[in-house]
């Protein structure tokens, strides 16, 4: 995991008896010294915090105060209130009940024993306030305000991602911000409920636990803790017994292999959608324009192809990749092969730089990876060395990749069992190959089925059905709609007597000719199953071919069969 943010509570976590010790301050300074951002998340009011911790402005990149109702950026001395000021009617009702309290910019603070009286005052006045406990303290917060909402505002302002964040706390009011942390840590003397929900509990209490965690884990990018973070695993599908098939969100190096038109793109699309659904950022290099439909999902931007948005230059890409909520699909389908390789290499160089600085994008997916990382070697391979970031390479066969890339995977998925075994052999050697064979049953994969091998520890194989995609997949859209297929893959309208010789080298030309030939020619090819065979075998679209085959069995007349065939092709490929 790339830890770029360390968010901590104050009282009972880094501070004991109001103050931060010298040892704790030095540990926190070491975190910032590595370039990581240090955020303080506290229930205290800002003036009170600055009184008990005079070095707060120097120590922290941002402060979430008043339990999320106020945020403060020390470098620019900027304060933002995120909730309504305390209502005068509420304050008067509390005074009448003898409740002692302090007033912040948006918070009312008192002691836990006065909870009943505070709730009575809220009911009487009808204001929207939430009671939040912090051990012996009680806070009356504006509705919807938590430490989590305040921290989210800070992360947004600093363009940081919670998926690169560790959070540590000790009390009831820390639940919200720990829940949004990629790794939630509780000190050993935290309240029981917080310890139960945490991903990790320190051995030592309070500030000593924080120092322990920083020295043992934060400065090492959580390498020993990442395997525990199973709540973040991405579900690719399920086995026959409904067991989910997952890959870790962090540090996964996934290789997807298999012959053309067997479902690799579908499996890759499932992975991409699961990454996006989890709120992580994605960069997808798309040589054939297969993944443009991902733009239908929120926060996904497609560049290149025949679209309105040109591919970004390296400096523009550098800026785009630094937005944690934005994912990019770079469609290279309008380029020549040499141009694709050159541009992709520049993209990988920029991505390596941005990832080192920010941990973004969380996933890098390279389709047709053998073009950029060929078996004979490539300078681009040096830009993809093992790290904490996740990577997916998609290719026909492992042998098509540079040797270093064959050994890179921690997980291999395939739509063909033979290709899977070859990839495992390339990655781990004969011993692991025998192990994976022993774990699989040796049967060929059925259509719509895939297999996956986890290589990190004891290699094992599982057969599974990939999950359902949310958006329509259009395979090699530009290539088949506007490119030029060779004669042996083109469709020829010859008619029942063979007197015609009209070549359709792509789908756009096919639609044009099919719409213009006489009915006898159209019906001849329809009844002979020629359309079905071409769509299945040359366009590599078995789903559309199956639809047309269904029409062939329905006994449609010439005019209606032509209309329905064209309607389905146009709907699928927008030609």
Language model regions located:
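Active-site phosphate-binding/coordination module
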Residues: 17-106
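Short, structured coil segments at secondary-structure junctions
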Residues: 56-59, 67, 125-126, 180-181, ...
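Conserved ATP-driven motor cores of ASCE-family P-loop NTPases powering translocation/secretion/packaging/pilus
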Residues: 58, 390, 397-458
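Conserved acidic, metal-coordinating active-site core of Asp-based
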Residues: 87-181
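P-loop NTPase catalytic phosphate-binding loop
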Residues: 230-363, 373-392, 396-400, 405-408
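Terminal, compositionally biased segments used for targeting/anchoring and flexible tails
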Residues: 438-575
């Amino acid at each position: 995991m790339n830890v770029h943010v360390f968010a901590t509570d104050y009282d009972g976590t880094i501070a004991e008896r109001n103050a931060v010790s010298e040892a704790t301050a030095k540990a926190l300074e070491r975190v910032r010294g590595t370039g990581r951002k240090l955020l303080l998340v506290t229930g205290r009011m800002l003036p009170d915090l600055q009184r008990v911790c005079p070095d707060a402005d120097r120590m922290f990149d941002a402060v979430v105060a008043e339990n999320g109702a106020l945020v403060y950026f020390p470098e620019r001395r900027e304060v933002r209130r995120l909730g309504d000021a305390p209502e005068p009617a509420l304050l008067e009702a509390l005074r009448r009940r003898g409740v002692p309290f302090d007033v912040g910019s948006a918070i009312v603070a008192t002691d836990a024993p006065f909870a009943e009286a505070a709730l009575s005052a809220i009911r009487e006045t009808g204001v929207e306030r939430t009671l939040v406990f912090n051990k012996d303290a009680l806070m009356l917060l504006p509705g919807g305000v938590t430490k989590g909402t305040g921290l989210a505002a800070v992360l947004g302002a600093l363009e940081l991602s919670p998926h690169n964040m560790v959070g540590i706390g000790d009390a009831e009011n820390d639940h919200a911000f720990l829940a949004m942390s990629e790794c939630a840590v509780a000190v050993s003397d935290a309240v029981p409920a917080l310890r139960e929900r945490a991903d990790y509990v320190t051995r030592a209490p309070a500030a000593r636990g924080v120092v322990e965690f920083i020295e043992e884990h934060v400065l090492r990018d959580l390498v020993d803790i990442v395997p525990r973070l199973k709540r973040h695993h991405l579900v690719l599908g399920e086995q026959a017994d409904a067991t989910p098939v997952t890959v870790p969100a962090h540090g996964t190096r996934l290789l997807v292999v298999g012959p053309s038109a067997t479902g690799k793109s579908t499996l890759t699309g499932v992975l991409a959608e699961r990454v996006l659904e989890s709120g992580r950022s994605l960069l997808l290099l798309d040589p054939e324009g297969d993944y443009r439909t991902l733009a239908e999902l929120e926060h996904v931007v497609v560049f290149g192809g025949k679209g309105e948005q040109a591919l970004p230059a390296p400096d523009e890409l550098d800026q785009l990749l630094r937005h944690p909520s934005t994912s990019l699909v770079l469609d290279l389908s309008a380029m020549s092969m040499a141009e694709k390789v050159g541009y992709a290499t520049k993209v990988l160089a920029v991505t390596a730089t941005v990832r080192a600085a920010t941990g973004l994008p969380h996933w890098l997916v390279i389709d047709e990876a053998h073009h950029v990382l060929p078996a004979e070697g490539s300078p681009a391979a040096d830009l993809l060395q093992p790290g904490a970031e996740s990577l997916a390479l998609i290719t026909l066969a492992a042998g098509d990749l540079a040797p270093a890339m064959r050994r890179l995977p921690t997980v291999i998925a395939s739509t063909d069992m033979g290709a899977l075994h070859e990839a495992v052999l390339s990655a781990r050697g004969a011993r692991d190959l025998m192990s994976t064979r022993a774990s699989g049953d040796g049967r060929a994969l059925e259509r719509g089925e895939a297999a996956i091998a986890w290589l990190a520890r004891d290699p094992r194989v599982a057969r599974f059905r990939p999950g359902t995609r949310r958006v329509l997949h259009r395979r090699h859209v530009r290539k088949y709609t506007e490119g030029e297929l060779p004669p042996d893959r083109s469709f020829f309208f010859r008619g029942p007597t063979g007197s015609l010789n009209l070549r359709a080298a792509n789908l756009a030309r096919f639609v044009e000719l099919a719409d213009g030939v006489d009915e006898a020619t159209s019906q001849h090819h329809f009844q002979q199953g020629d359309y079905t065979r071409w769509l299945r075998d040359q366009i590599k679209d078995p789903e559309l071919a199956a639809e047309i085959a269904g029409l062939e069995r329905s006994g449609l007349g010439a005019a209606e069969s032509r209309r329905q065939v064209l309607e389905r092709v146009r709907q699928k490929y927008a030609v």
